[in-house]
Structures are given as C-alpha cells and as structure tokens.
Amino acid sequence: MTDTTQNPWEEDQAPDQAAAANHSHAAATSGEHAAAAGSSGTPAQTDPWAASSSAPAGNTPAPDNAADAWSNAPPPAASDVHQSAADWLNSTPTPTQEHFNLMDPFRHTLVPLDRWVTEGIDWLVLHFRPLFQGIRVPVDMILTSFQQLLTGLPAPVAILVFSLLAWQVSSFGMGVATLLSLVAIGAIGAWSQAMVTLALVLTALFFCVIIGLPLGIWLAHSDRAARIVRPLLDAMQTTPAFVYLIPIVMLFGIGNVPGVVVTIIFALPPIIRLTILGIRQVPADLVEAAQSFGASPRQMLFKVQLPLAMPTIMAGINQTLMLALSMVVIASMIAVGGLGQMVLRGIGRLDMGLASIGGVGIVILAIILDRLTQSLGRDARSRGNRHWYHHGPLGLLARPFIKSRA
C-alpha cells in the first residue's frame, strides 16, 4: 500500500490525451500558416470564391429577387385561389368554328325542329292551359258515366246484358260466344280492369263519332276543304302512337282523361276517311232521282246518302274502335287504368303471369267488339223488310203482339 500503486485506467487514457494534444497543435499551426498566406496577397490561390468577386462589372449577376421571381412575391390569398379554381371549372371552351362540308352536310343540325316544338308547346301551356283544362270537363263527365255504369253492375247482370245485346245486333251464336268470352274474362281475374278499359274505349268512340261523322260529311261535299284536311289525316295516321303522349301530358296532365283525349286524336282519322268515301260512293243516278223528285239537301243526306253509305261508315267505326283499344293500352304509360295497366305492371315487374292476364283480356275484348261492329255494318237491305226489332230477343217478345195485330 505505498504511493507507487498505479491506477490501471491512467495507462489507457494517456495515449488518447496525447493524440488530442497533437491534433490541437496541428490545427493551430495550420491556422497560422493560412493567416500568413492571406496577408501575403495571394487570394486567388487560397480562396476559390474570390474569382467571382473580382469579375468585371459588366458580368455582375442579377440581384437575388430578379433571379428568383418567387422569392419576394407574397403568397396568393385563399379567396384568389378559390376564385381562379371556380373560374376554371365554370369556364366553357371556346367553340371552334367549323366550316360547312359539302361531303357531310348533315353532320350538324340545320333545322332546330326540337327547339321549335319545345318552345311551341311551352307557349301553348303558358297561354292556353285554361282552355285545355276546360276540354277535360265533358270528357271526364262522359267517362265517369260509362265507368260508373259498367263497374256498378254486378258481373252476372252485365254478362247477361252484353250477351242479349250481341244476340240482338248479330245472331244467337254471337250472343253465346259473347257470354262465354265474358265469363272467361271474369274467370281469369280481369273483370274489373276489363270494364275500365271498355269504359275508356266507349268514351273515345263516342267523341270520335260526334266529331268524325259531321266532319266527314262536310269534307265529302267540299273538295277544297278535303284537299286541305287530307294531309293532316295522313300525318295523324302515320305518326307513331308514343309521339302523341308527350304533348298530351304537357297540356292535360296524366290520368284517364288525358288517355281518352290522346285516344280520340289517334283513332279519329279512319271514321273521317270512310265517311267521305261512303258518301262519295253513293250512285249518282240515285242522287239524281232523289233530286228529280224534289228532295231537299237534308232529305238527300238522311234518306239517300247516309243509309247507302252506312256499311262503309260502320267499317270506319270498326277501325276507330280497334285503334282506340290499342291506344288505350299504350296510354297506360301515362297512368291510364285498365287492362293496359296490368300489362305494363307485369312487364315492369317481370311478372309474365300478370302481363298474360292483361293480354288475354285485351284479345278477348277486341274480338267481341270487332264482331259486334261488323254485324252492325251489314247492309240493311240484306235483312229484307224486317225491322231491327223483328229478330233477336226483342223479336221473341214482340212476336205475339205482331201476330195479334195481323
């Protein structure tokens, strides 16, 4: 335990301290040499950046704010950023002017018919909407009457009445066929919808007869008016059924009454055309004979022309009835009820059973109406001297009274 006891860590730290001392001495020496060199006047060799400071005045670089245009610019305000973004989004591209190409003349629309039609319908709706709403009143009244009558009758009573009516206007076989057909409609569950469809069709037929017969009689006696109206009738018959729906919805709305209105417009041309044809086909010698006996124009019309033209007129009524039935089905797209609505709902739901019920009901109803109107169109001369009440169920009831009078 003498003073000669050594610290074992001193031997390890001595070399490190010596190395640190040598390093600091070398750094001091190099600093002195650098100072001496700087004072000796050789900056180009010791300071590599001195060349840039000793450059000619003409090659002096631009200031920092000129070299960097964004260094001193203030940051854009948030409102300016949003405004520029909005302007960019809302800006429309500048239209490029294209010259007319003779080899492709119809690349662009030349006649803006769609815009004209849209503006015309908007103008009609704006100025004449009360008029079109007033047209709904008589149509709604007649439709409501037919619908209440047909849907208010019990099904057995209605079937019996229709069967007797078919027997009266046609034959006993037609009465039986009508009976079986109506029973089939009720059996498949389409009776109420079939009565709604029948009410729509009868309402449209009623107005078509009221409008079409007088118009056809007038056009049959006026060649100038017939030449003016004939192109309109051609356009009405060739226009697709769906095209009628758009202006009717704009002017009248949706529902059963607009459906009847569009059906009237669609089914009107046949009765007008065939009324004109029937009256003009009356033999000229019969007309001359009536005139020679002093018949007045009214007597000529009701006693000669209309009775002889009745088969042709009834053919027009038959065509009008068939077109009305087809249009009532199409008009189900504007919320018209009946069998067409069943078909539309079945197609929309991919329910083929429901669509089939509506389709079968439409077919049966169309066959019944077609056969009945064809029977009404038979020439009165084919019945002989018998009156309409001398046959059918009314003939059975009136026969005892007729024999008693004889």
UniProtKB/Swiss-Prot annotation:
Residues 15-42 have a biased composition (Low complexity). The keyword Transmembrane helix applies. Induction: Induced by increased medium osmolality. Repressed by glycine betaine. It is found in: Cell inner membrane. It is a multi-pass membrane protein. Pfam families: BPD_transp_1 (PF00528). Residues 194-373 form the ABC transmembrane type-1 domain. GO terms for molecular function: amine transmembrane transporter activity; carnitine transmembrane transporter activity. InterPro entries: MetI-like, MetI-like_sf. Keywords: Amino-acid transport, Cell inner membrane, Cell membrane, Membrane, Transmembrane, Transmembrane helix, Transport. Residues 1-83 are annotated as: Disordered. The chain crosses the membrane at residues 149-169, 171-191, 198-218, 248-268, 320-340, 350-370. GO terms for biological process: amino acid transport; choline transport; glycine betaine transport. Its main location: membrane. GO terms for cellular component: ATP-binding cassette (ABC) transporter complex. Disruption phenotype: Uptake of glycine betaine and choline is completely abolished in the ousA-ousB double mutant. The complex is composed of two ATP-binding proteins (OusV), two transmembrane proteins (OusW) and a solute-binding protein (OusX). PANTHER family: GLYCINE BETAINE/PROLINE BETAINE TRANSPORT SYSTEM PERMEASE PROTEIN PROW (PTHR47737), GLYCINE BETAINE_PROLINE BETAINE TRANSPORT SYSTEM PERMEASE PROTEIN PROW (PTHR47737:SF1). Part of the OusB ABC transporter complex involved in glycine betaine and choline uptake. May also transport several other osmoprotectants such as ectoine, DMSA, DMSP, proline and carnitine. Probably responsible for the translocation of the substrate across the membrane. Belongs to the binding-protein-dependent transport system permease family. This is Glycine betaine/choline transport system permease protein OusW. It comes from Dickeya dadantii (strain 3937) (Erwinia chrysanthemi (strain 3937)).
